[in-house]
Amino acid sequence: MENNKKNNQKQNSIDETEFPNSKVLLVSVKRTRRFLERTARELLAGGTRYIILSGLGDALPLCVQLQASLQSKNAATVVKIETSYSYFNTNYSYTPGLKIYMEKHPEFKGSRISPGYVSFCEKPDKFTPIFDETPNEYICSVNAGDNNLHVGGEGINAAFSELLSAHGHEVDKYESLFKELLSKAVKENSEKADDEVKSVLYESVEKKYPDVKLALCRVRNSLKKGSDNTTGSVFIVTFKKKFPHKKEKNMGMVYVVGPKGKNFNSVEDFLDAVHETAENLMTALCDYNGLVKREEIKHVRMNTCRICLFSGHAFKHSNASKLDVAKSILNGLAVGYRHGPSPRLNFAYDENVFKDAWIETTGLQVFNHNEKEQ
């Protein structure tokens, strides 16, 4: 057994030298091919160049099936195959082994986000509703906010104000809530790199803000302008009782402060800021669900987040298209995506740009909201 361990260590060293930037995917019959393929695609989309499919014994057929599936879909190509026949003291027998070395296909696009986690709203008569009247799962909806941190004004921010006011919310209080929470987030994270920033909670928020059950904020230090930390910041609030359409599953609002195009000299810098904001959004969503899973807060899991085209209208850079903004949002979300805590992502209709961006950047299938695969 000790010899097998030494041989494995030696082989791993050889693999790292011959195939830099590689990941070993252990193939087991305890996992479905669908799960293994999704994992392989996520690794490739995340920057891995080589996938090494490794299986023993009864996993060999599954290993070959996985290789064939990845190759047929232009995800990866075979560069090397190794077979082995090793003796294991644990069962006093020889076991066949297989390693299939695959390199990312040059035409591979893909996404770290599982296709089953993404859906798109169909074209509405006017606008995609902020919340459905009969939701079948717990959902939060993104509000494209601004640097003043108020709820109201124009576009979807005005629609949020109207909807929440109609259900009894004191919408004017959200601005002071967000400013207090932002101040706390900045104080606790001002010297940290973005990947070290922690989401902060407003303790006992319902005492001062009775419409709110929970309030969370995550800042994006790289987008700070002078003393202004608002750009790129994300706020999650869950409602205490006054739910939109009187449905408890319409659980909360996600207030996102996207970048303003007029504040950027180049369209590239603007789109980079959109990308960073979307990454921060996804991280905040995962942080919330992570707190729920670890029972650090007694709240329900957010099953779905409906996402609008923030920074894609009045705030859009004059040289950027809506499709450019949608691509940056999708790519940013993919960077922050974590399969376990991430909610499903439902994209509001906006000239079909989210669906077009998904197909163009990933080449993957699409789903309509509350519809079967098309």
Swiss-Prot record:
Q: Which CDD domains match?
A: MAF1-ALBA4_C (cd21101)
- Would I find Thylakoid among this entry's keywords? no
Q: In the UniProt record for this chain, what is stated about the effect of gene disruption? A: In sexual stage gametocytes, genetic disruption causes a significant increase in the number of activated male gametes with no differences in total gametocytemia, sex ratio and mature-immature gametocyte ratio. Typical coordinated arrival of the sporozoites to the salivary gland from the midgut is affected. No significant differences in the prevalence of mosquito infection, oocyst numbers and total number of sporozoites per infected mosquito. No significant growth defects in asexual blood stages.
Record flagged with keyword RNA-binding: yes
Keywords, comma-separated and alphabetical: Cytoplasm, DNA-binding, RNA-binding
- Localization, UniProt: Cytoplasm; Cytoplasm, Cell cortex; Cytoplasm, Perinuclear region
Q: Where is this chain primarily localised?
A: cytoplasm
GO CC annotation = cell cortex; perinuclear region of cytoplasm
Give the Gene Ontology MF terms in alphabetical order. Answer: DNA binding; RNA binding
Q: Which SUPFAM superfamilies match?
A: AlbA-like (SSF82704)
Functionally, this protein is described as follows: Possesses DNA- and RNA-binding activities. Binds to DNA with relaxed sequence specificity. May associate with the subtelomeric TARE6 repeats. Regulates the abundance of transcript sub-populations in a stage-specific manner. Regulates activation of male gametocytes. Participates in the coordination of sporozoite development in the oocyst.
The family note in this entry says: Belongs to the histone-like Alba family.
Protein's recorded name:
DNA/RNA-binding protein ALBA4
The record lists the organism as Plasmodium yoelii yoelii
